Amino acid sequence: MFERKNFENVWEGKMEPFKIVGDVYFVGSFAASTHIIDTGDGLILIDPGYIETLHLVVDSIYKMGFKPEDIQYIVNTHWHGDHTGATKALASLCGAKTLIGKNDAEKAACYFKADILLNDGDVLELGRTKMRFLETPGHTKGTVSLFFETEENGKTYRVGMFGGAGANTLVKEKFDYDNCREDYLNSVHRLLGEKVDVFIGNHVWNNNTEVFGEILRKTGENKFIDSSLWTNFLNFCEKRAISVAETDK
């Protein structure tokens, strides 16, 4: 939806970490987004990314004032290696429990064996954070999306992530499973019913992470706090999925 930068090697896409809002921090790279949530009783990390960029993620965690040992849970939104490639190594480093949607566990096994399998409606509670998961298949069969609340300056914001927005697996030759197109559209429609104040992407081009982060650092203006970003992105995903289906019959 926003500008996508490509690098010959994924580890070249280094980004400076920053606090998005409340307890939510970006510690990822151009290649794949990684977020941490400071729950007060340890960190929840979302999508460690590529194994080749794990050193960037760990460095960013330190820069934000935390340590890998603070991580209690590693949430994986879907099984693809650009999000889960570093899960096994990071879990070994910090001792965290790993989570993934139950329908992605088998394919994720080439990267790691999950400690906790997520079902629709499951809630992960740690400290002041309650993270709710919805099964949103399409990109993969076991994709999960997630929602939680965070506070800043006396205001409460609902944070949301679409766990698998990519349309690349909606092309016939790259289908993750049968009926993925129908599932994807149903997932988008379901997510449109969720109220989200702060949309975090699992890739930086989903929500303009780089540009909004620079604005936040330089001016203090927080463009991440905008409910229209969520609905606009989901509408974009719907149109793109329909277009793929029409051109790839």
Model-derived features with residue positions:
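Short, flexible loop segments at the rims of nucleotide/cofactor-binding pockets, characterized by
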Residues: 22-26, 74-77, 175-180
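Short Gly/Pro-enriched turn/cap motifs at secondary-structure boundaries
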Residues: 15-16, 25-27, 113-116, 135-139
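Metallo-beta-lactamase
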Residues: 43, 50-52, 123-125, 130-228, ...
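N-terminal pre-domain segments of enzymes
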Residues: 1-14, 237-247
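Active-site HxH/HxHxD metal-binding segment of metal-dependent hydrolases
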Residues: 50-55, 61-123, 224-226, 230-233
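Conserved beta-strand hairpin/beta-sheet module of binuclear metal-dependent hydrolase folds
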Residues: 10-64, 68, 145-166
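Structural recognition of the beta-strand scaffold that forms the well-ordered cores
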Residues: 26, 44-46, 73-76, 97-101, ...
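Divalent metal-coordination and catalytic microenvironments
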Residues: 23, 37, 47, 78, ...
